[in-house]
Amino acid sequence: MTTDSDTALLFDPALALPSGPAPRRTSVGVRVGSGPGSVQVGGGAPIVVQSMTNTDTADIDSTVEQVAALARAGSELVRITVDRDPAAAAVPYIREKLDKMGCLVPLVGDFHYIGHRLLTEYPACAEALAKYRINPGNVGFREKRDRQFSTIVEIAAKYDKAVRIGANWGSLDQELLTSLMDKNAGSAAPLSVGAVTREAMVQSALLSAARAEELGLKRDRIILSAKVSSVQDLITVYRMVAARSDYALHLGLTEAGMGSKGIVASSAALGILLQEGIGDTIRVSLTPQPGGDRTLEVTVAQEILQTMGFRTFVPLVAACPGCGRTTSTVFQELARDIQTYIREEMPLWRSRYPGVESLNVAVMGCIVNGPGESKHADIGISLPGTGETPSAPVFIDGEKTTTLRGEGIAAEFKTIVQDYIERRFGGAKSAAE
């Protein structure tokens, strides 16, 4: 029983908590690429989705095919490995073929060990790339490291390219780490090995960025990352980097893993940081199944951002998980079919029906929550549960509009969805024209 005091407490405005993420961390905006395909990372711009190919970059046709597939899936930046001479020689041809296809997605060159030489000897490669990714832990050692790092930065400044300086747990600057470990050993209150390693990660990224600026690379050309494989360590490291700088930040686990493990790890780590306002671009590093679809990492990245309310990419399909009241698989099959249908149609819908990505669809499985959830969606259908009347009421904008019956429910509901989209979003295209 609720008392008067309980009721007052429930409606006390002072107890209400705001919904939504913390304000975005202020960061320097970095323009990656030029022309129609360019994107801004940081500076208040929408959080950018990026991905990476796993083809042999020297295989021009395969790389072009995969870059185009990733871009069609929604990747706004695509990184390619540039690890040897044939790969560097192929880059301008890859760019040319993509441009001819109308695929303007900016390409990021991933350099390790010999990036200084490849960028020097293949100037067409240096020009064709929109951004360079370098790892301060494997540019070189001592004087050689300084010289090789300087070469890459000077080339980036010459061509006005963005640079991601990416420290990695697995290839951390050993000189810096050893120095910090030695200092820690002599401390009156030494930190744990993990704490010192995290500090080394942060310092590696920040010191390298400061050196890049000294060499003439503008602040609005620098993006930082500090990647590890542990979710908790990643969260801590990025909090540290965010607190000490205003560089744009690239988020991602070094190796998230395969299947559901990789998806959960990335969602947990990135979700917490994004909720705290940290992060300007994300990549979900999933280990693909043999022959698996590389675009899955793009889909997961988009779903993280859309689920958290940062961006909208495709209409959301909400479906109940099922229980003993839903022994039929009809609602599961319909939810799957509608989700597939929407993703297949989105390339066309995106251009024809501006704003369609904000659509919410509900496919529910029984009378308990079905009608209510369906009313909250833009379009919803409540399928019959076990023992219920074999009919499926359809709700549009909160109002029941029709009831579907028989074997053609799925096809009829798809038609209703298509008609609603044309009616609600078709006018936006006409108005724009």
UniProtKB/Swiss-Prot annotation:
It comes from the Bacteria. SUPFAM superfamilies: Nitrite and sulphite reductase 4Fe-4S domain-like. Its cofactor is [4Fe-4S] cluster. [4Fe-4S] cluster binds at C320, C323, C366, E373. Keywords: 4Fe-4S, Iron, Iron-sulfur, Isoprene biosynthesis, Metal-binding, Oxidoreductase. It catalyses: (2E)-4-hydroxy-3-methylbut-2-enyl diphosphate + oxidized [flavodoxin] + H2O + 2 H(+) = 2-C-methyl-D-erythritol 2,4-cyclic diphosphate + reduced [flavodoxin]. GO terms for biological process: isopentenyl diphosphate biosynthetic process, methylerythritol 4-phosphate pathway; terpenoid biosynthetic process. The keyword tRNA processing does not apply. Pathway: Isoprenoid biosynthesis; isopentenyl diphosphate biosynthesis via DXP pathway; isopentenyl diphosphate from 1-deoxy-D-xylulose 5-phosphate: step 5/6. The keyword Metal-binding applies. Binds 1 [4Fe-4S] cluster. One of its GO terms (molecular function) is 4-hydroxy-3-methylbut-2-enyl-diphosphate synthase activity (flavodoxin). Its EC number is 1.17.7.3. HAMAP family: IspG (MF_00159). Belongs to the IspG family. Converts 2C-methyl-D-erythritol 2,4-cyclodiphosphate (ME-2,4cPP) into 1-hydroxy-2-methyl-2-(E)-butenyl 4-diphosphate. This is 4-hydroxy-3-methylbut-2-en-1-yl diphosphate synthase (flavodoxin).
